Structures are given as structure tokens and as C-alpha cells.
């Protein structure tokens, strides 16, 4: 869509039409002391000057080897991703309300949705959400709408920022949140769910791998949840689905999660995208846009926005959400990422992440002053290590050696004093892991 700003002749004509001489007269009703002062902006720069200016700013950043995750992860992004999403046809998140005019954009959304459905084993995906936290909160709202109940059970293993977002969404509602505490093994035991879920429970929200990296027994938990006629919301790291059972296989009703691991850079925490997939019975209650495939009157394949009567531009305050397509560019990155890896490549990538994390785990827990918090548990990317050493000292020594160390879990939960959350992805080499363990041994 072309955008050409007004020239001086256009501006003069508009001012004459509304009967004023200068744009500043539009603001006469605003007291002068409340008006913005003149902005201290220098004159224009040449391309070379601009490049040098931002290069100087960027040079102040310190590049570190990362062993920290906790929601945002250092994964390799194939060059294919940037090549595709950087095309002018895609370089915007916005889908116009005359959406059928943008067939390429709609097809890319449709392909993304198809891949998310294949990955999760569920029937319908939306066009994406803002991030994992909002996707989780929207899943809770969906469950409340669909069930007509007002009690939500949430695992303590849910990312704490996701939990806070859910609480914010429900702050002025009548919904009740009950926290399911993790066991000493770092998981939610099915007996704990069985004791807490009742006829008033709208949904049970379980994250796997959970915030501590531990993989939950989702099939066993699903059996308990389904026996009580409650909805099961699975919060996932999509990369883990390369090796672990899909939500569709263990009969989850809703699957959500953070899509950053699928081709989006860390970017200091965002922007990324969230994904959501649901069983067919819930698709009318699902938030966000949905692209569908159809044929025109001549039998040609085409794409449309479907089930639009759920949305804000039609339902207004009765809409399922105010989510539109503002995260679609990042979702497109996820689509390209998944397509590029393919089934076998994606599985192999997940296996490499498991292998490298296990290698680091075995090295670290063998050091004096370090031990596993959750022994003999399957984990993905992340693991918790308990230490008798000074954590602040460890972090500072690692920083001096160019390493962003693990997360100090005491800042998240006081029950995890002296505990560190390590993260190891496919980006980390054995040499880097060995260097990490050498520094920890000397700390």
C-alpha cells in the first residue's frame, strides 16, 4: 500500500478549507503551558551518517554467551527466516479489514495455522497472539466462557510472569484461581489434581516442560482432569514437541505457548508471538483471527478471514478478545522456521537440545558444591541446580568471563533459595559448556 505524505500545496489547501492559517491554530484550545515544547531533534542525516550513529550505539552492547532461559531462549535462526519475512510483501503485521485483498498475507497465516495444528495435534489454530503470557491468559478466558464455571487450577510450574498476566486478566472477574503446588520431584502429581479438581472447575492449566524445565506426565494428568469434566489447557515449549507427545495425543482441549523459539530473536524479551490451538468444539470461543481456505465462483483456491462474527469489528464488546494480527510477522517467522526444518529436522533439533542440556547437567552436578534439585527427572533445555556457593559471586565471575549465568531462583520463589536455573540450547558448544563448568568449579 503506497504512502505519500502531503506536499506544501496540499497542506495549504487543507488549511484554507478549514479556515485557518497555520497548523498550530488547531491546538489553541490547549493551554500553552501544557503543550509539548519544541523537540530537540537534529537535522537530517545521510545514510552513512545514520549507519555510523547506530553502529556506535550498538558497539556499547556487551555480547555474552548465554546459559539463561526462563521464557526467552537463545536458538539459532536460519537465514531463510529473515530472507522471507524481510520481503516487502510481508514486512508489516497488519491485515486490512478488506482482508481478501491481501491473499498472500492470508495464505501465510493459513499455512502458519496448519503447521501449529500439525504440531499440537489439535483441530484449529488462530492467527497468533501477542506472546506466551497473553496466550495463556486468553486460554483461561476461553475456558471460563466455554464451561460457564468460575474455578481455575493452575500449576505452580507455570511461568511466574504468565501467572501474573492471568491474575491481571481476571482481577475484576468472579473467577477463582487455585494454585497446584509442585512436588519435591518438581512436577504436579496426579493425586494433587484429583484432590483439587471438582464440578466447579472450568480448567486445569499445566505447563510442560514447566518453568523449572521438568517434563510433566501430561497423559496421566489428562486422565484425571477428563474424569472430572474439566478442560485441560497445556502450556508448551513448541520445540519440545519435536520429541514429546503432542497435546492432541493426550487429549488436551487447548494448547498455548510462547513462539519465540520458532525463529524470533530474543530482543530483550520481545516482541515475539503466542500460539493457540483448540479442539473443534471450542473454535467459536477462540480469540483472534482465523484464516480459512475456500474457492471463488470460478473454482480457484482463495483465502478469507473466517468465523468473523467472534471478532471485535463485528461483536464489539461481546467479542472473544481484542487480539487481531499484530504478531503475524513473528508468526510468519515461525511458519518459515518450521517449514525450513521439516519433520525430521525439527525432531533432530529437539534431540540436540536435550542432549546438550543433559551433558551440561551431568558436568555441573558432579562439581563440588553443586547438586541436582530434581534428580532422575526428564527435562528439556533447563534444569535446576542447588549450590552451597555464593550465587552473587558466581554470577559476577561468569559475567567477567563473558557468560550470562543461570537465573537465581530465589528472586522468583523463596522456597528455591540457593537454586540456579540453567539453560542450554543447541547454540551452546561443548567447549562453552566445559568452560562454564571450569569457572563454576573455581568460583
Curated annotation (Swiss-Prot):
Q: Looking at its record, which EC class is this enzyme?
A: oxidoreductase
Q: Which UniProt keywords apply?
A: Oxidoreductase
GTP-binding among keywords:
no
Instruction: Tell me its EC number(s), please.
Output: 1.4.4.2
Tell me yes or no: is Lipoprotein among this UniProt entry's keywords: no
A GO MF term:
glycine dehydrogenase (decarboxylating) activity
Instruction: Give the SUPFAM superfamilies listed for this entry.
Output: PLP-dependent transferases
A Pfam family annotated for this UniProt entry: GDC-P
Q: How does it assemble?
A: The glycine cleavage system is composed of four proteins: P, T, L and H. In this organism, the P 'protein' is a heterodimer of two subunits.
Cross-referenced PANTHER family, in alphabetical order? GLYCINE CLEAVAGE SYSTEM P-PROTEIN, GLYCINE DEHYDROGENASE (DECARBOXYLATING)
Q: Which NCBIfam families match?
A: PRK00451.1
**Family of the protein in this entry:** Belongs to the GcvP family. N-terminal subunit subfamily.
Biological role stated in the UniProt entry: The glycine cleavage system catalyzes the degradation of glycine. The P protein binds the alpha-amino group of glycine through its pyridoxal phosphate cofactor; CO(2) is released and the remaining methylamine moiety is then transferred to the lipoamide cofactor of the H protein.
Tell me the protein's name: Probable glycine dehydrogenase (decarboxylating) subunit 1
Per the UniProt entry, what species is this protein from, by scientific name?
Answer: Endomicrobium trichonymphae
